[in-house]
Regions:
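Conserved SAM-binding strand-loop segment of SAM-dependent methyltransferases
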Residues: 82-94
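Conserved SAM-binding loop
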Residues: 76-77
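Conserved SAM-binding loop of SAM-dependent methyltransferases across substrates and taxa
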Residues: 49-61
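A short glycine-rich, Lys/Arg-flanked "PGG" loop and its adjoining helix->strand segment in the class I
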Residues: 122-134
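SAM-dependent methyltransferase
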Residues: 139-213
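A short acidic, Gly/Pro-enriched loop at the edge of an enzyme's catalytic core
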Residues: 97-104
């Protein structure tokens, strides 16, 4: 369990994003290495509260953080004081950054699997192509196959836990089940405050089925050149990822 100061006065969207995503670090060395090779400016797609943006910007690279959530970006701006960071509130499938070109575009974690299938990915690739500099790199992480489970038939993973100003936040994955075009992850979110008051709510997230070969083919159809993919290993807490590399 880690203690931290309250982000954005306990805005629930910010807190749960930090609890469920903020501790993941296995991919950071790759993003850092790519920034070293390609330089800035860097576009971070699905930036959230800045897990990747802050890591890259702290090494001196200009980063534009794009996310559709104003609340998450507000928290990011607070944390980015003194760093070369700009935020843009927009949907990754429908954004325009006039006059901007990026040598590196990053799409970390499973962001690309939230685009809503082939049409959503095609829309994103069109937007990305419009802002990627000639010879630049678009690096897209997709999760390796998720194993289905439920809490009745097997032991679920350990919860993600964080304490903020005496309030304990816990997010526990309780099932992953398959649908025709994706996988649905069900979590139970619980809080316990300093008086012992407890809240419980359910959260569902749907990830599109997507494999590297499919994404590479979609990238080629959108006019990108396909480079060798990179692997991010799994950990005890997180599945591994494959990072598809597309060049402008």
């Amino acid at each position: 369990m880690s203690a931290a100061r309250a982000p954005r006065a306990h805005v629930p969207e910010v807190v749960w994003h930090d609890v469920e995503c903020g501790a993941y670090a296995e991919d950071l060395p790759l993003w850092r290495d790519l920034a070293t090779i390609h330089g800035g400016p860097v576009l971070d797609v699905g930036a959230g509260t800045g897990r990747v943006t802050l890591h890259v910007a702290a090494r001196g690279y200009e980063v534009v953080a794009l996310d559709r959530s104003p609340a998450l970006l507000a928290a990011l701006r607070e944390r980015a004081t003194g760093l070369p960071v700009q935020t843009v509130a927009a949907d990754a499938r429908d954004f325009d950054l006039p006059g901007r070109r990026f040598g590196l575009i990053l799409v970390p974690m499973q962001t690309a699997q939230l685009f809503g299938g082939p049409e959503g990915r095609a829309a994103f690739l069109r937007c990305a192509a419009a802002v990627l500099a000639p010879g630049g790199l678009l690096a897209i992480a997709i999760a390796d196959a998720l194993e289905t489970f439920d809490e009745v038939r097997c032991m679920p993973p350990m919860p993600d836990i964080r304490e903020i100003d005496g309030i304990v936040y816990a997010s526990r994955p309780v099932s992953v089940h398959e649908e025709p075009d994706g996988a649905v992850i069900r979590r139970i979110r619980e809080t316990v405050d300093t008086t012992g008051h407890r809240t419980v709510e359910e959260d569902l997230i749907r990830l599109d089925h997507l494999d590297p070969a499919t994404l590479e083919a979609e990238g080629a159809a959108a006019g990108f050149r396909v480079d060798r993919a990179r692997a991010i290993p799994e950990t005890d807490e997180y599945v591994g990822s494959t990072v598809v590399m597309l060049r402008g």
